[in-house]
Amino acid sequence: MKTVSIFGSTGAIGQMIIDVILASSDSYQVKALVAKSNVQLLAFQAKIVNAEMVVIADVGLYKELKDLLFGTNVKISVGDVGMQMAASLNVDYVMMAIVGIAALVPMVYLISAGVKVIALANKESVVCGGTLLFNLAREKNVNVIPVDSEHNAIFQILHSNDRENIDKITITGSGGALLYMDYDQMRNITVQETIKHPVWKMGKKISVDSATMVNKSLEIIEAYHLFSVKPEKLDVIIHPEAIVHGIVSYVDGACIAFMSVPDMKISIMYTLSWPNRMSMLYKKLNLASYHQLTFMKPDINKFPGIRLGFEILRTSNIHANSIIFNTANEIAVDAFLNRKIGFLDIVNVIYSTLDMVDCLHINSLSDILECDSIARRVASDIICKLN
C-alpha cells in the first residue's frame, strides 16, 4: 500500500484526487490532508479516506475543525507549523493542489524535507519558484511530476522517448469559454459566461485563465523550467476538442502526440502510480466517436494574454518578470471574479504591472515573496484607479 498526502485537498483538483484514491482505496493510505479554510469539506474528507492528520491554514478555524472531528483519531494542526509538519511526513507521493503562489512555500518545505515524489497540480509555484525551486529539487533528489494535462502529456512522452533530438514541444489549449466570441463582445462578458468551460471541469480562477489564454503563457514558462528546454523550442496550438494534450516533434520530422479523454483524473492516476500505471478507472478514449479533431493557431490579437509567456522568456530577467506576471494575473482575476474590473482589463492590468515593477535580483525565497508583495500592491493600485 502506497502512502500519500494531499495539499489543497478541498479545491477542484484536490477533490478529484480524493475521488481517484477512493476508487483505489485498497492501494493508498492517506497520511495528511491540507486545506486553506473549508473546514466542513476537510473534516468530511478526513473521515472518508481515514486520514491520519489534517492541517487547516486558517488558525482561526481550529476549534471548528476540532469539533467536526470529535471522536476520531485524526491529528489536527494549523497554520505554517502544521504545513511544515505535514511536509515532513515520510510518504510515497505528495499531491500538491494548492492554488496560486500560495503553493510555493509548502513546495519549498516539501523539497527541503526530501520527499520522494511531488505530483504538482500548481503551475504558479513553478513560474514563481523558477530555477531556485528546481535547483533545490535536484539537490534533494526529489521527483517533480506535473499533473496538468499538457505537461503531464509531455512528461509521459519524454519519459519514454528520446530527449536529445527535440525540435519542438507543443502545448495544446482548448481555447476556453470565449474562443469563438468576437473581441467587442468580450467587453461586457459576465463572470458566469467566462467560467463556463466547454470541456474541462475546473475551478473559477483557472477557468478565467483559460478564457484569457493567460494559462497558456503560464504553461509555456512552466514547460521552460520543467523540461529545461530553450524558449524557441516551445509552441502553443489551439485544439478545441482537448483530445491531444501535448506534442513532441523531433528533428527528423517525426511527431509524438499524447491523447486521452479530457479528464484530469487520468493524469492524477498516472502521477499516483508513477513510474508504473494503474488500470483505467474512468472513461477511455474512443476515437471513432470524434468526427474530426481541430487545430488552429492562437489569435494573439484577440487573446494577447497568450503572448506574455513568450515575451517574458525573451527578457533578461525571466525570473522576476515571471513572478510579476503571475502575481498581477492573480490580482486581476480575483478583481474580475469580484466584479471590480471587466474581462478585457485583466491582461491590461498585467502589462501595466510589468511596466511599473522591477525586481532586480531573485536569489532566495524571500526575494520571490518580496517581489510578489510589490507586484501585488502595484496591481491592486492599478485596479483601484480603473474604478
Swiss-Prot record:
PANTHER family: 1-DEOXY-D-XYLULOSE 5-PHOSPHATE REDUCTOISOMERASE, 1-DEOXY-D-XYLULOSE 5-PHOSPHATE REDUCTOISOMERASE, CHLOROPLASTIC. It catalyses: 2-C-methyl-D-erythritol 4-phosphate + NADP(+) = 1-deoxy-D-xylulose 5-phosphate + NADPH + H(+). Mn(2+) binds at residues 148, 150, 219. The keyword Oxidoreductase applies. The keyword Metal-binding applies. Keywords: Isoprene biosynthesis, Manganese, Metal-binding, NADP, Oxidoreductase. This is 1-deoxy-D-xylulose 5-phosphate reductoisomerase. It comes from Ehrlichia ruminantium (strain Welgevonden). GO terms for molecular function: 1-deoxy-D-xylulose-5-phosphate reductoisomerase activity; manganese ion binding; NADPH binding. Pathway: Isoprenoid biosynthesis; isopentenyl diphosphate biosynthesis via DXP pathway; isopentenyl diphosphate from 1-deoxy-D-xylulose 5-phosphate: step 1/6. Its EC number is 1.1.1.267.
